[in-house]
Amino acid sequence: MVHPVRVGKRTRMSFSRLKEIGHMPNLIEVQLDSYNWFLKEGLQEVFEDINPIQDYTANLNLEFVGYKLDMDNIKYSVEECKERDSTYAAPLKVKVRLLNKETGEVKEQEVFMGDFPLMTEQGTFIINGAERVIVSQLVRSPGVYYDVSVDKTGKNLFSSTVIPNRGAWLEYETDSNNIIYVRIDKTRKLPITILVRAMGHGTDTEITNFFGEDERLKATIEKDNTKTHEEALLEIYKRLRPGEPPTVDSARSLIESLFFDPKRYDLSRVGRYKFNKKLSLHLRIVNQISTGDVVNPETGEILVQKGEKIDREKAVQIQQCGINSVDIEIEDTTLRVIGNNFVNINNFIDFNIDDLNIKESVYYPALKQILDNYSSEESIREQIKKNIHNLIPKHIIRDDIYATVSYELGLAYGVGHTDDIDHLGNRRLRSVGELLQNQFRIGLSRMERVVKERMTIQDQEVITPQALINIRPVAASIKEFFGSSQLSQFMDQTNPLSELTHKRRLSALGPGGLSRERAGFEVRDVHHSHYGRMCPIETPEGPNIGLINSLATYAKVNEYGFIETPYRKVNKKEKIVTNEIVYMTADEEDEYLIGRANEPIDENGKFVDSKITVRDKEDVIVVPAEDVDYMDLSPRQLVSVATAMIPFLENDDASRALMGSNMQRQAVPLLKPQAPVVGTGIEYKAAVDSGVLPKARNAGVVSYVCANEIRVRRDSDGGTDIYRLLKFQRSNQGTCINQRPIVEKGEIVQQGTVLADGPSTDLGEIALGKNIRMGFTTWEGYNYEDAMLISEELVKKDVFTSIHIEEYESEARDTKLGPEEITRDIPNVGEDALKDIDDRGIIKIGAEVRAGDILVGKVTPKGETELTAEERLLRAIFGEKAREVRDTSLRVPHGEAGIIVDVKVFTRKNGDELSPGVNKLVRCYIAQKRKISVGDKMAGRHGNKGVISRVLPEEDMPFLPDGRPLEICLNPLGVPSRMNIGQVLEVHLGWAASELGWHIATPVFDGATEEDIIECLKKAGYREDGKTILYDGRTGEPFNRPVTVGYMYILKLAHLVDDKIHARSTGPYSLVTQQPLGGKAQFGGQRFGEMEVWALEAYGAAHTLQEILTVKSDDVVGRVKTYEAIVKGENIPEPGVPESFKVLIKELQALCLDVKVLNDDNQEIKLKESVDEEIENLDVNIEGNEDFVLSSQDNDYEEPEENDEEDELNLDYDDLTLDDLKDDLKIEDFNDEH
């Protein structure tokens, strides 16, 4: 039944039927944990991999002994970094030891290796003043993968790929003639026996003795034209290095370096773990019949007798005592199964070795050698440490290769299984830490080359570590990663939810991942292993669908990078569901039957029903209660945070829920945030973890509160914690970040208590929109095609008003002709244009500005012109140089206006770091209040989006029997075909809740039912169907049937009409074609494309057409003359030759064709060579800005607004302005159900 739940400072009435068992993990721990791992272990691993660096004579030896991040010498705090456009980083100091073996001299030094970017508490990085997020990447895990294809005759052909983390690939394939081939590193294929011979089994008998008799092996041997180990080596060498003289030694060293050199071939821990899992013996011999006795080699005991079936325990026992091949009987033939000879070390050692940190299986021959030669605990421990790389090899070993071949042979008999590459057991996550580690490794290996060179060149006696090490390549590779990697993205900061989701995003794109074009349907599709790990709902529409995903709410990432999800264990003996929580990866989960979270259970934890619905891989089946192994932890564990915020998700169609999830991320923070009346109960957790709320660091008592500061007196030592609040800061997306205190003086706070509200939060809960009184009714056609009719009350009361802050900057540089100057003294500008400019030439704070107003007065020196004699005389008399400057002031761009809220000035003199050639930098921040207006895009949480079509006076809006007018009317036709019924349930429940004064929590898949809602409506005194008689505001007559009325949570999205509306008469033109530019950003025109020209041709509108193709576009002289004619009120002159025609002629001339243009009388028309020649004689400049091209090149580098990948992410056809689409417009683009 409905019960109160306390969330932060608010109590919600919850309809949840389930007790919360485990808590949701911290939502940004993916980022934080990964970065901490990198600082603690990741960096260390890279240094260990590269140690030691030796010169070519192996005399000098350079080692990295240790490192530390110097946290005390961080130059600027996070806030200062944002202000100064610098990077939030700490110096990395590395201790380096140089050993000269000849003289035995050791030199140790601490070397500075560049500033290393630090992660903020919110899981972001500040790079050049911009907040960025490193997105986790989903990649194929290193390992062995087997696949099957069917040939024309219906025969199964098996193939396999051995994928390392880095190094050469091995690919096996079988053809229709039963011959198995191998490709080494994508070269031409060889019979597989050549590889086996080269590995050491030289003759045919050795091969058959090792792998057992097998038809496919026989066929391959017949095909193979080499007969010995040496011949095979030479054959491989010829294939891999064609054109070089083959010798046995060079072939041997080639193979060594390809596969067995840890510097060239790296499996990584994950790869080794996947190899051992896939190639282990016990998984393939389980439930098979042995053809001979299996004997323990140590004790001589018979583990399995001839003809006995091997059960799971026996199979594990066989592998763990070091047996590596077993013959089994399949369909009257004997098949030899070979493993890769790895065992669990704890079965062989009777003392505790936890401190050695060995979690993987170890290579049995290496272990046996240690145990045979040493007996004391000390010496064994010592040897294990010394030989750790032999016990757990980083590279592939011969036994791995034999095991992969054996697996390939076994597949034909149904032993082993093929793999599904889209299964999350075979895809892993590379989070920040690992991506950084790989990048750091690239930098270090480049540095290693430099060090080796310097070792040989410099004098070995006086050399120091400092002189050897060049930190440039390391610093550059880190900088490159943060600045321009596809996975380092400009943070989406529209609201707290979009920040949180961005940090939890998983991308399959990026370096080493997929590309949009190659990704097929399978990769993008929802897979059964996504359950509880990746959200099946939240993914962008458009070209990236399914390639960019979101982490599910309860998911965690394990040490190998696989995503795990929690389950409750079922005690099968007592048939009780326990509260023990187990995290499982996707391939572990496949072995169990898992019940759903809302399966009815009595108070003792027993199942109520005897038959239970469970998941078994991709099937949902019904089984007896005693067969269930685990149970889901929570009904919302399969969806992401944004999706979990949609109430009644279970009643929405999936594609609409997808739009709902994505649009919540685009909601603009409003002036007065309001938490949803109908929520899901996750709003508090999401806001707290998003990092926009200041939380108490320690328990204590609030001693002081004002608008921008809160002080808390600590209980522990009586000291004071000070929390500064952010006031009206600009976010990455230009929305407003503002924090307001929600605690009072004297209030007792615990550690983690929310002290203040941030943007889009209300009492610590995420509040993206407003609860609006609305009805599903049409009104005079203003609801056509999802449009919304809103009441003027929403405008008057600032219900949907938001603040937007834009940043403009101007820099004074040194030019060839002298320095630019920021000044109030601007040529040809009247005094009234300077009324708000102070004496420095910079606008005053608080001034109201409109488009075209000067923000920063700046003049640039012009080239000195040749002086006339009179001027020289005047100059000689007055000594006054006529100032040759032109006005390059920063002005407010078209369509922008607002109030100056902040001005920041940085100068060289004050010691601010500015880019080279810049003397002074001025930044102005303009804030504007944007009220809701016609053309703004609004949406609910269920994918029900629309554009405002009309603002109606409140007296004309339909009103309720008690006289309250509706605030919004939505079209009822928007509901049935879209199948997002959740919005209707939300409206009904909101209607009842507002009357009862409740805030409600209805968690996804565990929320209010239809009966609950009817119950609430009755309690509130409304009709059971939630409908009401409405009256027409204009006439006072009732409408002819009752209408569904209630409260819906409505968001205002970041697609505001003010940012899209745009007009141009004249403006900038493209340099080559002389046609107007396109798009609002360039102050461009509307393209009149090919199809539009056809339309005019079809009408026969010849003059209009000629005008559009010439004077309105690229007839340089004609357009200026036309402009003058319009200004003077004369007739428009005849068009001339368009520039495109000249370009065409130039291209034909480039093909050596002599082209002449003739008039009616066969006289040649002379074309001017260049645009400049034509413009020389014209005295009017219609480009608006005389140096448009110059000013656009002033800024060599601008922080990209969004990064490229993001740009393509949000291709939402409904919101594209026409000029974004260029001319590949299709009519379907405008159809809502695209």
UniProtKB/Swiss-Prot annotation:
InterPro entries: DNA-dir_RNA_pol_bsu_external_1, DNA-dir_RNA_pol_su2, DNA-dir_RNAP_su2_dom, DNA-dir_RNAP_su2_hyb_sf, RNA_pol_bsu_bac, RNA_pol_bsu_CS, RNA_pol_bsu_protrusion, RNA_pol_Rpb2_2. Residues 1189-1212 are annotated as: Disordered. Pfam families: RNA_pol_Rpb2_1, RNA_pol_Rpb2_2, RNA_pol_Rpb2_3, RNA_pol_Rpb2_45, RNA_pol_Rpb2_6, RNA_pol_Rpb2_7. Residues 1195-1212 have a biased composition (Acidic residues). Its EC number is 2.7.7.6. GO terms for biological process: DNA-templated transcription. The keyword Transferase applies. It catalyses: RNA(n) + a ribonucleoside 5'-triphosphate = RNA(n+1) + diphosphate. One of its GO terms (molecular function) is ribonucleoside binding. It is an enzyme of class 2 (transferase). Keywords: DNA-directed RNA polymerase, Nucleotidyltransferase, Transcription, Transferase. GO terms for cellular component: DNA-directed RNA polymerase complex. DNA-dependent RNA polymerase catalyzes the transcription of DNA into RNA using the four ribonucleoside triphosphates as substrates. NCBIfam families: PRK00405.1, rpoB. Belongs to the RNA polymerase beta chain family. The RNAP catalytic core consists of 2 alpha, 1 beta, 1 beta' and 1 omega subunit. When a sigma factor is associated with the core the holoenzyme is formed, which can initiate transcription. This is DNA-directed RNA polymerase subunit beta. The gene is rpoB.
